[in-house]
A protein has these predicted regions:
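Metalloprotease/metallohydrolase-associated module, dominated by Zn2+-dependent proteases
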Residues: 2-63, 67-71, 92-184
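Short basic-aromatic helix/loop recognition motifs at nucleic-acid
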Residues: 76-80, 98-101
Length: 187
């Protein structure tokens, strides 16, 4: 089996996963964002409110996966990506799913995320943002033979501890969902 140890291959692999998630959980309704792999202190990923990338004359959102978080179990990477895709889905429909400068995830976010095989728990500061994959999402990953990513940036900081699964799943690290500020707001 090939191993994901090269950055360029990881980028392509994340695009493949995004396409599979878009098909399964959004009926291909999401506009394709540009996937980036950058440092995201205190977060596993983010999506931009604005369309900050130009690609072949088309403006596109950015969906970032934290460079220092790539060696988490693949189901956690998938849960982070799906979390950010829910923000994109809500954004495309004009649904405000965050407040307090884009940091507090409200029940509109929670409701859409739980429809898509994510377990969403409440955080006292950031709202409905603590994200773990459900058993169904873990099975989705297994059914598609998704493999672990084996390249990671050493960021020198620690992310929040795991909340663990509530439905018999292994203890898994949560997605904070906090994003960097882009323009006037952030998700």
């Amino acid at each position: 089996m090939k191993q994901l140890t090269e950055y360029n291959r990881v980028s392509g692999y994340l695009n493949k996963i995004l396409a599979l998630l878009n098909e399964t959980y959004f009926e291909n309704a999401l506009s394709k964002p540009v996937i980036t792999i950058q440092s995201t202190p205190r977060a596993y990923g983010h999506v931009t409110v604005g369309k900050v990338w130009d690609s072949d004359g088309e403006r596109r959102h950015e969906l970032n996966i934290g460079a220092g978080t790539l060696t988490r179990p693949i189901e956690n990477i998938v849960a982070t990506m799906l979390h950010e895709m829910v923000h994109l889905y809500n954004l495309q429909r004009g649904v405000q799913d965050c407040s307090r400068g884009g940091t507090y995830h409200n029940t509109k976010f929670r409701d859409e995320a739980t429809k898509r095989d994510l377990l969403i728990e409440h955080h006292k500061t950031y709202g409905w943002t603590l994200t773990t994959p459900t058993d169904n999402l873990i099975m989705w990953c297994l059914d598609r033979d998704l493999i672990e990513i084996q390249v990671n940036r050493n960021e020198g900081y620690n992310l929040p501890p795991s909340t663990g699964g509530k439905n018999g799943t292994p203890t898994i690290t949560p997605t904070t969902g906090k994003a960097k500020k882009i323009g006037r707001a952030h998700v």
